[in-house]
C-alpha cells in the first residue's frame, strides 16, 4: 500500500492521502480550538489534539473529506502528548466538523478511537439578527425565560450562545410574521443570569453564520449569582453530591442525638421526682402516725363504784357514828373506748 505525503508549509502540517487505518485500538484523545470554534473569516485558529496516552502521531480529519487526513508528530510534556494543527487563514472551505486520532510508531495503521466532534464555524458573513427577552432582561427568580432571535433576513436556522458554554442551542426559524423570521428559545425557570448572543444561518451552508447579535444580559433578581452555571462545568453552589450526603447524614445524627438527650433528661427528671414524692409520702405517713398518737391517745376510763348506792345499810345518827373515819374501797374498772372518765365511789 502506497501513501502519498504532501507537505503544506502554509498551515504547518502534512496531508496524508491513502487508505484509512484501523481505528479504536486506544482510547480517544481530546480536540480543542484556540481561541475558539467560532472564527471570523481570514482569522487564525489552532486545533489542538491531546491525550494522556503517549501517542507518537496525531491525525486530524474533517468530515466529508474521506481522502484527506492531516498528520503531525506528537509532542510529549508532563505526561501529556499533543499536537497543534494551525490554520493561518480560515476560509469557508476549511470550516466544518473535525475529529482527531492518535497512533503509535510500531503500529501506524492502528489508531485510537476518534475524539468528540468539533465544529469550526465562520461568523460575520451576513446581517446580524436581533435578540430580546419576552419578559424583559430583568426577571424574578423562578419565572420562565424565553429569548427571541429575529431578523428580516430569511434565515433557516437560529443559534443561541451563552458566554462560558461550549455549545449553542439551535432552532429553526418560524414563519414570517410582520416582516421578520423568528425563533423563540425557552430557557425554563430563571435561576441565574447570563450574557447571550444569537446568529442566523442557511441550510445549504450550516458552517457559515451571520454576524453576532448585540449581547443581551439577562439578570435574575432574588438570586445573589449573576452567571448561569455551565452544564459542562460544576457549580460551586451545587456542591459535590458526596459532600451533600455527608452533610445531610451529619445533620440527621445531630438531630437524633439532641432528641435522645432530651428524652433521657426527661426520663431522669421524672424518676427523680417520683423518688422525692415517695420520700415525702413516707414522711407524711410517719408524721400523721405520731400526731395521732399525741393528739388522740387511748383514753382509759376509770369508774369508781360507790357501793353505798347499791347496798342497804342502817343510817345512824352522827353522834352514834364511830370516830375513826371509814375506809372507803375504791374499785376501778377499765372501760375500753370510753370518751370520758367517771368515778364511782363504792362504800363498804
Curated annotation (Swiss-Prot):
UniProt GO cellular component terms: plasma membrane
Pfam families with a match to the protein in the record: ig
Membrane topology value: Single-pass type I membrane protein
Biological process according to GO: immune response; immune response-regulating signaling pathway; natural killer cell inhibitory signaling pathway
Glycosylation: residue positions: 67, 84, 144, 178
Stretches assigned to the Extracellular side: 22-245
Cytoplasmic side, ranges: 265-348
Membership in a protein family: Belongs to the immunoglobulin superfamily.
Protein role: Receptor on natural killer (NK) cells for some HLA-C alleles such as w4 and w6. Inhibits the activity of NK cells thus preventing cell lysis.
Assembly mode: Interacts with ARRB2. Interacts with PTPN6; the interaction is enhanced by ARRB2. Interacts with PTPN11; the interaction is enhanced by ARRB2.
Name of the protein described by the UniProt record: Killer cell immunoglobulin-like receptor 2DL1
Record organism: Homo sapiens
Gene: KIR2DL1
Amino acid at each position: 500500500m502506497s501513501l502519498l505525503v504532501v507537505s503544506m508549509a502554509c498551515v504547518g502540517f502534512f496531508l496524508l492521502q491513502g487508505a484509512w487505518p484501523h481505528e479504536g485500538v486506544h482510547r480517544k484523545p481530546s480536540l480543542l480550538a484556540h481561541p475558539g470554534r467560532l472564527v471570523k473569516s481570514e482569522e487564525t485558529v489552532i486545533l489542538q489534539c491531546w491525550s494522556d496516552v503517549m501517542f507518537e502521531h496525531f491525525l486530524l480529519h474533517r468530515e466529508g473529506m474521506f481522502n484527506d487526513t492531516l498528520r503531525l508528530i506528537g509532542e510529549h510534556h508532563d505526561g501529556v502528548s499533543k499536537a497543534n494543527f494551525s490554520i493561518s487563514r480560515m476560509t469557508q472551505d476549511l470550516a466544518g466538523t473535525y475529529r482527531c486520532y492518535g497512533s503509535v510508531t510500531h503500529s501506524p495503521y492502528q489508531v485510537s478511537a476518534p475524539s468528540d466532534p468539533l465544529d469550526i464555524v465562520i461568523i460575520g458573513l451576513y446581517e446580524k439578527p436581533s435578540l430580546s427577552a419576552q419578559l424583559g432582561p430583568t426577571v424574578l427568580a423562578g419565572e420562565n425565560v424565553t429569548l427571541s432571535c429575529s431578523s428580516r433576513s430569511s434565515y433557516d436556522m437560529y443559534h443561541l450562545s451563552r458566554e462560558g458554554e461550549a455549545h449553542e442551542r439551535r432552532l429553526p426559524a418560524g414563519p414570517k410574521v410582520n416582516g421578520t423570521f423568528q425563533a423563540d428559545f425557552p430557557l425554563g425557570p430563571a435561576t441565574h443570569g447570563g450574557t447571550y448572543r444569537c446568529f442566523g444561518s442557511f441550510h445549504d451552508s450550516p458552517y457559515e453564520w451571520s454576524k453576532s447579535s448585540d449581547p443581551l444580559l439577562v439578570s435574575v433578581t432574588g438570586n445573589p449569582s449573576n452567571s448561569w452555571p455551565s452544564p459542562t462545568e460544576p457549580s460551586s453552589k451545587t456542591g459535590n453530591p458526596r459532600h451533600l450526603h455527608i452533610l445531610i447524614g451529619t445533620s440527621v445524627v445531630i438531630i437524633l442525638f439532641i432528641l435522645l438527650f432530651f428524652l433521657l433528661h426527661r426520663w431522669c427528671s421524672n424518676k427523680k421526682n417520683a423518688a422525692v414524692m415517695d420520700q415525702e409520702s413516707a414522711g407524711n405517713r410517719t408524721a400523721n402516725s405520731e400526731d395521732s398518737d399525741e393528739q388522740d391517745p387511748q383514753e382509759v376510763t376509770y369508774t369508781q363504784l360507790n357501793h353505798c348506792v347499791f347496798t342497804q345499810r342502817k343510817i345512824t345518827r352522827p353522834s352514834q357514828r364511830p370516830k375513826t373515819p371509814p375506809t372507803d374501797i375504791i374499785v376501778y374498772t377499765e372501760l375500753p373506748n370510753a370518751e370520758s372518765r367517771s368515778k364511782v365511789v363504792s362504800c363498804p
